[in-house]
């Protein structure tokens, strides 16, 4: 009989079945050996043939009833019906042919037993159409083996009848010699067969009745359907036909195979067509999967197949450039390169997610602010202080397409930016910027080489220090960078041919757009007049999303309204070009004239406008704006006498080389006519390293007015000069009394002022 998994072997269970098998086989064998030969000679040869066929049929049905699955239902898992085990009712009723049949919950198998199913206490299994558990076959009798059990009873009964009948014939013919061996053995077999014939015949008759009624032994004993109608009966003939001729019911429990299956595994990540040509593979199998020690030798055929059908791999990584090669390229700059005038030491700001790479922007000698038409020697001719060397220079949106980068430049590894010290970051907010304290301290001031001014037609110019290139460590894509991108190809500054324009290059331009067409050199124009409107940005807006386009359009509309307000305010409040003290006019003008997003403008103004420009911390640097507010207050309180002018001129005369012209330190958008010597002038060097104020000659008011009349298109509302408001330019270009104030006989006093972000300002008094 098939054992359920986990059950122990019980020898007592096999005693009845072993006894039945021994009696059956032993008695039949003795009958065929001692009785059948005489019956064959005396009666007929058909007697042993008949008994032999019946005996084989008995053995076959006995074996099937013993070893066949009776129809055991599999048990439910422990977690499958855990909740139903506690909350399920004990019985459930179902309709079978219109009759209510009760199903009982099995606490052992964890399911409701189907109709006519019962749990065997010996086998500990629920059996379909359970009849009884027979100890003589050591198996439950159920739906799948009841047929063979019933046939076993019938055949055994017939075999026992034949053994007893033919044995009796033999004994009657040998009555004189009952003591003979053959007669004694025949009488013993007849006793055994006759002894078990009564119960077997009775059991066979009982099951014949059950089969004809369509019942099981369990239903008959428990009294089911005793007083009612059996819903499972099919009639007498139908029931007999169902038991003997119905197809075999399926098996619900399959025992796991005892022999391990040989599974052929193929190594992963190899194409099947390559395996036939490859050498044998050495594969290690472990409990957690496939651990390959794939020592496979590559054959020529497999390599050829790989060439014909390449694997789906990504593009190969470009070769890396050695550090020495990249450093040598930086040390020997090429003309027109964006990094030609920059030092070898590189610092790169954090790269946003949308950028594929970011060119380095090293620290080192910074180029002073100059006009578009001036020529300035290389960085070797500049002498910078320690503060300017330690400071860092970050550009808001660097150019992504440098003109002279190589294939390896795209993947060059840039070192991280060195962190800023706390003294450089917050020194502007912690120090006093009064001129009284600055007069007690001296500092090294930068001596600039003589600059040469060249004339040219007035044309808009994009400087390398445009408003969109303000120092910014975020490197984000701002609206100003979209509307005011730098030269895509890195235009060279006319004043510094070796330095490329470090403006933002739009990532939406196609690769072929390498630069803008060359423009004529602009000539000097009046500082009080604004430049022409800037040319439209080369940004391709068709690649932008609707949200960005809507924000850009809204920004443009707001700029148009601000431009109209500034033009009206400019017509109402005329600029006299004189140095004025803080008054209500200055405050009103600072509040009415809001700063524009771009378009530098240099105008005369009051002291309060000094701190309004974002380049000196206006809107982008509130801490520096506060520092410069105290600076402007100190400047307004300083006595405007000839002594300050003498000291300023002395500082200009003591500088190595001839004194630079007034236009050399102005914004390219606000270049004015050459001013005669002797007029105090404020020179502002815009950059994260230094900002110096030098007095020079006074501008001619009449010439500026004539210049404004000659070029009415240049007269624009006040804007920013390198990120600063018009008030700062007014402070620097305030007119003073000519004559004795231009005497270069006294020494200058220089004040170093540190701002937020590592910006250093040197103010010469």
Curated annotation (Swiss-Prot):
The modification Omega-N-methylarginine is found at residue 441. The keyword Oxidoreductase does not apply. Residues 301-311 have a biased composition (Basic and acidic residues). Residues 293-352, 509-540, 613-746 are annotated as: Disordered. GO terms for cellular component: Golgi apparatus; Golgi membrane; mitochondrial membrane. One of its GO terms (biological process) is peptidyl-L-cysteine S-palmitoylation. It catalyses: L-cysteinyl-[protein] + hexadecanoyl-CoA = S-hexadecanoyl-L-cysteinyl-[protein] + CoA. The chain crosses the membrane at residues 14-34, 53-73, 149-169, 191-211. The modification Phosphoserine is found at residues 337, 606, 627, 675, 725, 743. One of its GO terms (molecular function) is palmitoyltransferase activity. Coiled coil: none annotated. It comes from the Eukaryota. Residues 1-13, 74-148, 212-765 are cytoplasmic. Keywords: Acyltransferase, Golgi apparatus, Lipoprotein, Membrane, Methylation, Mitochondrion, Palmitate, Phosphoprotein, Transferase, Transmembrane, Transmembrane helix. It is found in: Golgi apparatus membrane; Mitochondrion membrane. Pfam families: DHHC. Residues 104-154 form the DHHC domain. It is a multi-pass membrane protein. Palmitoyltransferase that catalyzes the addition of palmitate onto various protein substrates and therefore functions in several unrelated biological processes. Through the palmitoylation of ABCA1 regulates the localization of the transporter to the plasma membrane and thereby regulates its function in cholesterol and phospholipid efflux. Could also pamitoylate the D(2) dopamine receptor DRD2 and regulate its stability and localization to the plasma membrane. Could also play a role in glutamatergic transmission. Belongs to the DHHC palmitoyltransferase family. ERF2/ZDHHC9 subfamily. The DHHC domain is required for palmitoyltransferase activity. This is Palmitoyltransferase ZDHHC8. The gene is ZDHHC8.
